[in-house]
Design a protein with these regions (language model features):
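Short beta-strand His + acidic residue motifs that chelate non-heme Fe in jelly-roll/DSBH
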Residues: 43-46, 64-66, 86-87, 93-98, ...
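Short, surface-exposed beta-strand-loop junctions and turns on beta-sheet-rich folds
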Residues: 51, 70-72, 110-112
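Double-stranded beta-helix
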Residues: 94-128
């Protein structure tokens, strides 16, 4: 059986922190580029119940924040070009770009808009 090849541009989704380029999203997997256009751009601390994701830092660097689900404490680490990170289901996480035009290649299980649970907007420092 011959399966036709589908060539098309990615879907662009505008975000407050930049934009996403959706390469593919279906019941098997999702692939996206997350483009943080400005330094210190960030998405909210959030988690997913259905989605498991892996990030590859393609360009730039980020402060990667997460909440330890065992003790509720915040933790953070600088991640840079060439690093990869696995985000398990239910793991609260956040990225803050440290350079303009920082890019993450994300591969995950299927993306559902309703599967994003925000804990807070802004950065941990905004909570103080």
């Amino acid at each position: 059986m011959i399966i036709p090849i589908d060539v098309k541009p990615p879907k662009r989704v505008e975000k407050a922190w930049g934009h996403e380029l959706w390469i593919h999203n279906d019941e098997e997997y999702c692939g996206k580029l997350l483009v943080f256009e400005k330094e210190m751009a960030n998405f909210s601390m959030h988690y997913h119940l259905k989605k498991k994701e892996t990030w590859y830092i393609q360009q730039g660097s980020f402060q990667f924040n997460w909440i330890d689900v065992e003790d509720g404490l915040h933790d953070s680490r600088i991640i840079k070009e060439g690093d990869s990170v696995l985000i398990e289901r239910g793991q609260p996480h956040q990225l803050i770009s440290l350079q303009e035009n920082s890019i993450v290649f994300e591969v995950s299980t299927q993306h559902f808009d309703e599967d994003s649970y925000r804990i807070y907007r802004g950065t941990p420092n905004d909570l103080l």
